[in-house]
């Protein structure tokens, strides 16, 4: 079997074998930052993982395999995730696995887990990923109970930077939680688990109800269609609440109470208010149209306090000025005007920045609770196809309520592929005009919250929960319309051969001409070269636990070289501009990384600590008015 590599589409005109364009072709819309393009190229060599890596301890186990820590010959530590094809019984889960590989290999950001290499043979898929040695953010916060405001801002800025980058490239994560946010050896954020991610498009709605209960938005728990970014914004609000206050904002012990709290936005008032309370309230708005976007968060004053530039912006070089020059004051005035604009538009005063007294009433404070990702979706189409599909086509072909069936869960032991045909549903819904006399499309009565959640590893994909995990029972979205024609039933023998599912022209590597016609996921044999039916794969019992260490050969799907990551530079903080310095933090666990005690260090300077904040603010506004 020939091996495949992913290479950038640059230089001369690609050959016919390189015309299969995966989803990354449709990801690049914004000029900055760019994502990596991919194309498929054939090579004629195989790889033995036993000779390439020294396997160490196991990091986690899932339904389809395990994640092991390994060391390359160069000494670099990596996390190797092996997926056994004979364990994949649901085409939807296979689609999520492929989507995770293609999206993560396309993203290039210092705070997103990188995929180094992907291997595949007839029985396994092996993914070599970046290793985050300090575990996940859940364990880090649990050990320290509560972070300082400086450390909370440091973490949140990096999370916002990564999610903002994803949204710039029209990728929505949909499963942001503490367990999916890892820490590397330097204490920097690394977002993992893109198994539930997808592309989104303005004006169209996604209809996959997934995520983790305590981080799920009101649209998710109530089964309402959503665009995509607003779901991540709500999850960021929950994360910010946890980072600042050290507790969960909602009560997760009773799912009925949890649904009511999320639907009403009734999160617990913290016992000790913070300067971030305004941003938390903005992110946890029940109305998604009023909820803060990632652009709003990236330019918010609390997120950028102590930094000369907002999240996602590069520091502009100074032209011969010192911190007290007009140029520096103008920069500060522009920053204050931009970051305080939402407050001024809402008629807020400068005093609204100050902390308020905690409201009365004694309510128990919930602790941190690990979350298990939920997945309830009608099977989503090719992500690349969703970019080229016409709105009229989406409106004309919608399955009726009588034609919908609950999708098969990934934890069911028996899969009857010969009895039921795989039905393909559109991944997005176009807005439906409703006349005054016409009833609105019915929505499900039940959300995704039905049973207790289980622990899930950040390295393991959401479609691959822990062995003790359980898929929740959920209602579907029913949209009035003409029923869609079903596919003919598949032959039961087609599920025996799972070869080359990541290589040929599958769901995520179709050309523009192929996207014009409606496509289906197809069987696993349709994604691979035809093989004789007489040669069946080995039974699951014949595969040992340490089969990844065997001498079998793998085809390599080499990914393109990642763009060099710019070094994380220090920047002049507001403290330096105003001549203020903060004392070094004391106490164990207050800092995660080595903070440099120099004028360029990060700052946790709070607005409430400045005695003449009103005068400073007015002076900045006067400078701003003179410049304009």
From Swiss-Prot:
Protein's UniProt keywords contain Metal-binding: yes
GO molecular function terms attached to this record: ATP binding; magnesium ion binding; protein serine kinase activity; protein serine/threonine kinase activity
Sequence positions bearing Phosphothreonine: 208
Pfam families linked to this entry: Pkinase (PF00069)
Positions bearing N-acetylmethionine: 1
Active site (record annotation): 175
Composition-biased stretches (Low complexity): 457-469
Designated name of the protein: NUAK family SNF1-like kinase 2
Biased composition (Pro residues): 428-444
Entry keyword annotation includes Nucleotide-binding: yes
Protein kinase domain segment(s): 53-303
Residues bearing the modification Phosphoserine: 435, 523, 544, 547, 573
InterPro entries, per the entry: Kinase-like_dom_sf (IPR011009), Prot_kinase_dom (IPR000719), Protein_kinase_ATP_BS (IPR017441), Ser/Thr_kinase_AS (IPR008271)
Any one annotated GO CC term: cytoplasm
The entry's keywords: Acetylation, Apoptosis, ATP-binding, Kinase, Magnesium, Metal-binding, Nucleotide-binding, Phosphoprotein, Serine/threonine-protein kinase, Transferase
Activity regulation as described: Activated by phosphorylation on Thr-208.
Gene3D superfamilies noted in UniProt: Transferase(Phosphotransferase) domain 1 (1.10.510.10)
Annotated EC: 2.7.11.1
